[in-house]
């Protein structure tokens, strides 16, 4: 049985970690390098670093911050934000990241997923899917959750698997920062539709939320509850272990 992963997320803007609600109203939460080191010490399995304004500002990912963050941790680091080309993927991996997360560019240029996967291996390619519920369906949003692509989330998940993604980072925009719990429904629907691991994101508020989501996802990503000290990673892992979830201690 594969261990379930607990992954803190560093949403980075102007070199600082920030957190908002529904992708808006961002508040400063600290230095990414310090937080990454702290989370590894506390028992995190991986770190996800997202340069959240690179795409909408039309610029490249902050390489110096990526390099500094990668240099202080030994657990896997996934980096996303502003990735538009194979050269971008190569530079991020070359600066110490283990995986890249491609979101908007995957929708706008599907070849980027397949070419990157062929070049660096599917294990290095994560496709991030930001979803919002509209009526009874879930749709894919890009450009930091601002643009509705009109693409059905389940169809897109199946497609990115075929394109060569090794993993999906699935974020519920509706739940992001609300601390009302993960969107188990869409996570389960997508998990059943593909054979690659799903990292669930958006809505973690209490320790119990992780127990629920890890029944349908391979990993749980969270930000605010870790940044604010609401949940400590080792306490969370002990709780999960006691409740029959396989975790790495």
Curated annotation (Swiss-Prot):
Known EC number: 4.3.2.10
One record GO biological process: L-histidine biosynthetic process
Compartments (UniProt record): Cytoplasm
The keyword Amino-acid biosynthesis belongs to this UniProt entry's keyword annotation: yes
Superkingdom per UniProt: Archaea
Active site: 11, 130
InterPro entries per the UniProt record, alphabetical: Aldolase_TIM, His_biosynth, HisF, IGPS_HisA/HisF, RibuloseP-bd_barrel
Pathway it works in: Amino-acid biosynthesis; L-histidine biosynthesis; L-histidine from 5-phospho-alpha-D-ribose 1-diphosphate: step 5/9
GO CC entries: cytoplasm
Group of enzyme by EC: lyase
A Pfam family: His_biosynth
Record keywords: Amino-acid biosynthesis, Cytoplasm, Histidine biosynthesis, Lyase
Reaction catalysis annotation: 5-[(5-phospho-1-deoxy-D-ribulos-1-ylimino)methylamino]-1-(5-phospho-beta-D-ribosyl)imidazole-4-carboxamide + L-glutamine = D-erythro-1-(imidazol-4-yl)glycerol 3-phosphate + 5-amino-1-(5-phospho-beta-D-ribosyl)imidazole-4-carboxamide + L-glutamate + H(+)
Molecular function terms from GO: imidazoleglycerol-phosphate synthase activity; lyase activity
Subunit annotation: Heterodimer of HisH and HisF.
Family: Belongs to the HisA/HisF family.
General function of this protein: IGPS catalyzes the conversion of PRFAR and glutamine to IGP, AICAR and glutamate. The HisF subunit catalyzes the cyclization activity that produces IGP and AICAR from PRFAR using the ammonia provided by the HisH subunit.
Protein name as annotated: Imidazole glycerol phosphate synthase subunit HisF
Organism listed in the record: Sulfolobus acidocaldarius (strain ATCC 33909 / DSM 639 / JCM 8929 / NBRC 15157 / NCIMB 11770)
Lineage: Archaea, Thermoproteota, Thermoprotei, Sulfolobales, Sulfolobaceae
């Amino acid at each position: 049985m594969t261990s379930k992963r607990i992954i803190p997320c560093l949403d980075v803007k102007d070199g600082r970690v920030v957190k908002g609600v529904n992708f808006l109203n961002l508040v400063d939460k600290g230095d990414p390098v310090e937080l990454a080191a702290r989370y590894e010490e506390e028992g995190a399995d991986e770190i996800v670093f997202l340069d959240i304004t690179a795409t909408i500002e039309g610029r490249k990912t902050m390489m110096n911050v990526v390099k500094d963050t990668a240099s202080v941790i030994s657990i896997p680091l996934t980096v996303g934000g502003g990735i538009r080309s194979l050269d971008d993927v190569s530079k991020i991996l070359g600066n110490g990241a283990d995986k890249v997360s491609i979101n908007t560019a995957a929708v706008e240029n599907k070849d980027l997923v397949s070419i990157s996967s062929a070049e660096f291996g599917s294990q290095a390619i994560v496709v991030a899917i930001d979803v919002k519920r509209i009526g009874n369906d879930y749709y894919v949003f890009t450009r930091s959750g601002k643009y509705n692509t009109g693409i059905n989330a389940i169809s897109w998940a199946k497609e990115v698997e075929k394109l060569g993604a090794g993993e999906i980072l699935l974020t519920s925009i509706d739940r992001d920062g609300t601390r009302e719990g993960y969107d188990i429904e869409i996570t389960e629907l997508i998990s059943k539709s593909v054979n690659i691991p799903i990292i669930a994101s958006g809505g973690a508020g209490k320790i119990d939320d992780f127990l629920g989501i890890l029944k349908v996802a391979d990993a749980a990503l969270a930000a605010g509850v870790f940044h604010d000290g609401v949940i400590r990673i080792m306490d969370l892992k002990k709780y999960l272990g006691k409740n029959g979830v396989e975790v790495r201690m």
